[in-house]
Amino acid sequence: LASRRQRQMCIRDRSSGKTILKNCAIEPEIKDLTKFLSQAGANIKWSGRTCTIIGVNSLNQTSHTVMADRIEAGTFCVAATLTKGNLQIKNLDPNIINTEIELLEKVGAKIKTSGNKIFIKGPDKIKPIQNIKTKEFPGIPTDLQAQLMVLMCKSVGKSSITESIFENRFMHVAELQRLGAKINIQNNKALIEGNTKFIGAELMSSDLRASVALVLAAIVANGKSIVGRVYHLERGYE
């Protein structure tokens, strides 16, 4: 996992000798951490998914701006697509969400990029995608799976989402069904009917990404919805 590799990089950087990490995650956050540590004096080299770290005695003071949260940005892009919104996102390298941009364009969103800005306009009708599959970067991130499921519920036809990263990542489905979603789970695949008319309901979030998916669904539902356990949401969204 990316977070595990990040911890290993920080630990190994101060150890003596050479450490080689193989089959590493290559998410932008990993490369951003590499940039920060290198600025501080670390000796880190990459070759594909292999990271070689030569230990150093000490690290120097440095200044570094942490990159934007691509999952948060992707969530807002989904929100704009879902609500026929008109959104501008600043201070984000569009290249880190290229795959997400391509998918949202397929469903009908109009998206333009300029420097570190993204402009997105939601479509009048959301087109279904027959097989969305979560993958490691640069594929569709598992952390956007729940949000995309809400989007597909509002599409004009049938679609499916395959979760290939984590087990038991469909805990939000039962709550979406409370709102009226027609979703059938077959192992790690969700079959989604589309054309859903969400009706407000009391909902319970089970984790960070599920909670924001429920909020998105509630936004486009008829009537009042109450989402419980919002402390999950507060871990990843301001």
Residue ranges, per PLM feature:
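Residues on the solvent-exposed faces and adjacent turns
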Residues: 23, 55, 91, 122, ...
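Conserved phosphate/oxyanion-binding catalytic-loop motifs
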Residues: 71-73, 206-214
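Single conserved hydrophobic/aromatic residue that forms the stacking wall/gate
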Residues: 1-11
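C-terminal structural cap/anchor segments
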Residues: 139-192
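Self-splicing inteins and homing endonuclease
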Residues: 13-14, 36, 41-70, 81-82, ...
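Internal alpha/beta core interface subdomains
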Residues: 12-22, 28-32
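Structural signal for terminal/edge beta-strands and the immediately following C-terminal loop/tail
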Residues: 125, 227-238
